């Protein structure tokens, strides 16, 4: 009997009742009355229908799988039906497998299909091929091959389709199991299939990938012996193999043969695929000069669409980060009176910006005005940031003006990207000028614009200018400030030591604007006050946080622990840990690291070691940074034995030493013999 999942089943006179599966999700609790009524009606219909009504159950299972996309419910129903004597058919099986694959549950789909087979439910040949084709989308050829073998064991007369054979061979070749793929060729012949050009091309590509070029050439010759004419793609794949083996002369000879093949090829898509594969192979193996020769002499491959050929050259060169080479292809196109595709041209500029060639990218952007080229928004952002890092405001401004002329562009967003780039530069005047330009151009700044302006001014130390912008926001000249605005202003004030004004923003300005400070705001203020060595004020703000019913997080505790230790209040930090942090349960490796760092820097190495041991005993998980902090302090104090004890404790608790750990120990044993060091590592208890 076929069992899938447990199902509570209650018999009825004319059918049976499927109990609803338990669900504790919020969605099920808040389900609307209409949906509940519909489910009740379906449930009543299920009770009314007999097991022998196969047409109804086929529609029901298909609806659950295809419409509701709930294969688990379909499996529960099938399980219940099987208990009543129902035998699933090909349509039931196909619906369930397709639904599992749609949900990305390919491993389970493989297992379910095998369970169906083991239970004696063998679908027809067409359904088997459809299911195998769907399982191949999992890109798990070994699992799918196992399913095929089991299926043939149950159904001797079953023969996978040629398409499924070819797809399976291709997937096996991609994981370098070319021998297994070759065995499938013999298997398909034994079952009555004749390999086609796709079969041989796939196999040749697989052998070329594993550098078995002699075998690949034998397969190529065998292909001709079998009366199968190689197509352009077959020859292109073989050329790629010779290029991989650095046999350039043979590769170039075959290229001449390829051009002749392509002239006689009738399938345009096949010629395009062959050319694309050839260009990709050249780029992958570094034969860029050959690509430029082809680009300059396109008459060699005149059977390929010229615009497609140039476009693919550019795309392939950009993919392999040869952006200057791609720009050279553009100049070749222009010399022949052709225009590059906008997407290809955008890819060149984008790649140049990523590789540090923003000036060259800017030059290409200017030249792109000949055919009214505008970069994509993401490329514009990248170019703007690169130019601002080069401190070239003039060129950045020109790019801004170009993008503002782009039809359908979001002008505010274009300005925001420019402002964000200006924040890298120490140029507050330009930031304010952009704000004025937006107002003069009937482009109203939004919250993101003003937050960017205030953040940039604060980073440049122009907090007074930021406060003026904030005043304009509060008086209604701009949009009202939000929590991000005020948090940024408070951080800027604290960075300049203006703690009283920052506290005024927290305690007066935020409530006046009906903004409730969150944990991020409190964390920023507490951090700033501790940096100003105002520990009492910082702890007072923490008290406000608790009174305001704002839940402190691990970042809050890490800031406070670090601040108390820096201000030489280690005893207070210990008490805060015992009374507040540990009982709260909100502590992580950042809090542990802050406490350990503070203890070590304050000369409490023994307490740091005990704290580290207590954490592990309490079930907490200190990370490698925590252990490295204590080991580093032991090293500075010349305590070799203690350092290796911490190392051993680190390993016992499942943490592996990293490069920093070994660098610390290397400094500790700079003058020791290597054999002594190995003895210490293997047996730390006897070291000293």
UniProtKB/Swiss-Prot annotation:
Transmembrane regions: none
Start and stop residues of the PPR repeats: 53-88, 89-123, 124-158, 161-195, 196-230, 231-261, 271-305, 306-340, 341-375, 376-406, 411-445, 446-480, 482-517, 518-552, 553-583, 588-622, 623-657
Entry annotated with the keyword Transport: no
Domain of life, per lineage: Eukaryota
Gene3D superfamilies cross-referenced by the UniProt entry: Tetratricopeptide repeat domain (1.25.40.10)
Keyword presence, ATP-binding: no
InterPro entries from the UniProt entry: Pentatricopeptide_rpt, PPR_P_subfamily, TPR-like_helical_dom_sf
Keywords, alphabetical: Repeat
A Pfam family it matches: PPR_1
Family (UniProt): Belongs to the PPR family. P subfamily.
Record PANTHER family: MITOCHONDRIAL GROUP I INTRON SPLICING FACTOR CCM1 (PTHR46128), PENTACOTRIPEPTIDE-REPEAT REGION OF PRORP DOMAIN-CONTAINING PROTEIN (PTHR46128:SF211)
Name of protein: Pentatricopeptide repeat-containing protein At3g18020
């Amino acid at each position: 009997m076929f069992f899938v999942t447990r199902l509570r089943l209650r018999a009825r006179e004319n059918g049976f009742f499927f109990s609803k599966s338990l669900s504790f999700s919020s969605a099920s609790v808040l389900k609307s009355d209409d949906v509940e009524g519909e489910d009740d009606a379906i449930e009543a219909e299920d009770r009314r229908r007999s097991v022998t009504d196969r047409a109804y159950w086929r529609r029901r299972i298909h609806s659950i799988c295809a419409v509701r996309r709930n294969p688990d419910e379909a499996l529960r129903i099938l399980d219940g039906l099987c208990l009543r004597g129902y035998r699933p058919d090909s349509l039931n099986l196909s619906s369930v497998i397709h639904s599992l694959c749609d949900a990305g549950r390919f491993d389970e789909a493989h297992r379910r299909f095998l369970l169906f087979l083991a239970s004696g439910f063998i679908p027809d040949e067409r359904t088997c091929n459809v299911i195998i084709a769907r399982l191949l989308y999992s890109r798990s050829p070994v699992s799918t091959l196992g399913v095929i073998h089991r299926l043939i064991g149950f159904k001797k007369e079953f023969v996978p389709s040629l398409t499924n054979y070819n797809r399976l061979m291709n997937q096996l070749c991609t994981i370098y199991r070319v021998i297994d793929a070759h065995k499938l060729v013999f298997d398909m012949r034994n079952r009555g299939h004749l390999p086609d050009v796709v079969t041989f091309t796939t196999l040749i590509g697989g052998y070329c990938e594993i550098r078995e070029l002699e075998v690949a050439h034998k397969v190529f010759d065998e292909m001709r012996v079998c009366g199968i004419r190689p197509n352009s793609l077959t020859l292109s794949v073989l050329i790629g193999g010779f290029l991989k083996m650095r046999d350039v002369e043979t590769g170039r000879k075959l290229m001449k043969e390829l051009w002749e093949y392509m002239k006689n090829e009738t399938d345009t898509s096949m010629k395009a695929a062959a050319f694309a594969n050839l260009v990709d192979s050249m780029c992958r193996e570094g034969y860029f000069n050959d690509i430029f020769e082809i680009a300059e002499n396109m008459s060699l491959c005149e059977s390929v669409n010229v615009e497609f050929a140039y476009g693919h050259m550019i795309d392939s060169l950009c993919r392999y980060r040869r952006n200057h080479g791609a720009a050279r292809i553009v100049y070749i196109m222009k010399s022949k009176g052709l225009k590059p595709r906008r997407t290809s041209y955008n890819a060149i500029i984008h790649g140049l910006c990523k590789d540090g060639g923003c000036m060259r990218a800017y030059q290409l952007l200017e030249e792109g005005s000949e055919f009214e080229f505008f970069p994509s928004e993401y490329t514009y952002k990248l170019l703007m940031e690169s130019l601002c890092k080069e401190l070239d405001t003039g060129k950045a401004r020109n790019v801004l003006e170009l993008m503002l002329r782009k039809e359908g562009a979001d002008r505010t967003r274009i300005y925001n990207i420019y402002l964000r780039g200006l924040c890298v530069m120490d140029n507050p005047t330009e930031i304010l000028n952009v704000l004025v330009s937006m107002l003069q151009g009937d482009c109203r700044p939004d919250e993101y614009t003003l937050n960017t302006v205030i953040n940039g001014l604060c980073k440049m130390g122009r907090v007074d200018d930021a406060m003026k912008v904030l005043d304009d926001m509060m008086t209604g000249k701009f949009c009202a400030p939000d929590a991000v605005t005020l948090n940024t202003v408070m951080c800027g004030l604290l960075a300049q030591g203006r703690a009283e004004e920052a506290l005024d923003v927290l305690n007066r300005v935020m409530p006046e604007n009906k903004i409730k400070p969150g944990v991020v705001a409190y964390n920023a203020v507490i951090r700033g006050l501790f940096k100003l060595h105002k520990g009492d004020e910082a702890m007072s703000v923490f008290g406000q946080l608790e009174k305001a019913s704002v839940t402190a997080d691990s970042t809050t505790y890490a800031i406070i622990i670090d601040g108390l230790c820096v201000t030489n209040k280690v005893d207070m930090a210990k008490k805060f840990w015992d009374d507040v942090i540990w009982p709260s349960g909100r502590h992580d490796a950042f809090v542990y690291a802050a406490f350990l760092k503070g203890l070590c820097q304050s000369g409490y190495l023994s307490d740091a070691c005990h704290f580290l041991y207590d954490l592990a005993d309490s079930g907490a998980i200190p990370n490698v940074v925590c252990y490295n902090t204590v080991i580093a302090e032991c090293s500075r104090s010349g305590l070799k034995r203690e350092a290796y004890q911490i190392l051993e404790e680190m390993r016992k608790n499942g943490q592996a030493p990293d490069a920093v750990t070994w660098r610390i120990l290397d400094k500790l044993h700079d003058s020791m013999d290597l054999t002594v060091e190995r003895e210490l590592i293997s047996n730390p208890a006897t070291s000293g």
